Amino acid sequence: IHGREAPPVMVADFTFCHEDADYAHNQAEQYLATYLQSLLEHYELMGDHLGKTKGYTGYGKQAEVLRHIGFERYVEGFLASNAYGTPQQMLDKFKARYDIIGSFELATCFRFGGIPYEEAESSMRLFARQVLPELKSWA
């Protein structure tokens, strides 16, 4: 349309990087669930009012799906779509994504759902040391 190729898509990930895979999974699950619960409550996304509000019917349809699948499955799906784990697990996740959509820009969120600052910083530093250099080499 604009006479040039579209830039890579921007992908946002709620990220938790740790050397211990089980610990990374447990932390990501706990804090993503906390984040998602606050999001649902703040925006009242589980109610049926959105489907009746002009301009918000799309959100109403999403809320209907959320009510149908339940909070646990919502968290599972959200968790599956974000990158967390050991540095290698994260690279594997990013590689699988790259194989599907090609190049992408990455916006990472290391602090969400009440993760303590120290843990978020440790996760970010490990990601910067062991994941980011490899991601940069793909560009």
Describe each region flagged by the PLM.
Residues 55-58, 111, 126:
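Intrinsic disorder/low-structure terminal segments
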Residues 78-86, 108-110, 115-119:
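Outer-membrane beta-barrel pore domains
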Residues 116-136:
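C-terminal helical cap(s) of enzyme catalytic domains, especially alpha/beta-barrels
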Residues 1-103, 136-139:
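An alpha-helical appendage that flanks or caps ligand/catalytic pockets
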